[in-house]
């Protein structure tokens, strides 16, 4: 069994127009056989359910390793899974810089993602 290539797009803190939601389904067929490619979008948290409802494989831009608690502004891995995400970014350089995320925190993110049946995308 060979691995599929993952083509993913991170929207960062930029909402995309509805027309962009069709792009992930169309782009891989243009360049690669569709059976060799998986696609995913990492939209803003507010756009995740719109993308999922449009049939797009979706991931969270980050996830907190704890299930709940006093973590203002964070979203847990469990929450991401419950709304339908398949992937989550862990250790993105912007999160490490802007939010002072350490290697230990990123390791906890990866473990929590796996425990919650999300596929972690570890940024190095």
Explain the meaning of each model-derived region.
Residues 1-124:
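Active-site loop-to-helix "anion-binding N-cap" substructures in soluble metabolic enzymes
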């Amino acid at each position: 069994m060979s691995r599929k290539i993952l083509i993913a797009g991170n929207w960062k803190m930029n909402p995309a127009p509805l027309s962009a939601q069709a792009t992930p389904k169309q782009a891989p067929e243009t360049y690669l056989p569709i059976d060799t490619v998986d696609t995913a979008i990492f939209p803003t948290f507010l756009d995740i359910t719109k993308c999922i409802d449009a049939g797009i494989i979706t991931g969270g831009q980050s996830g907190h390793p704890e299930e709940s608690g006093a973590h203002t502004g964070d979203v847990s891995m469990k929450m991401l899974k419950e709304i339908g995400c398949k992937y989550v970014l862990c250790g993105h350089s912007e999160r490490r810089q802007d939010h002072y995320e350490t290697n230990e925190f990123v390791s906890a993110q990866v473990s929590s993602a796996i425990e919650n049946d999300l596929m972690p995308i570890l940024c190095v």
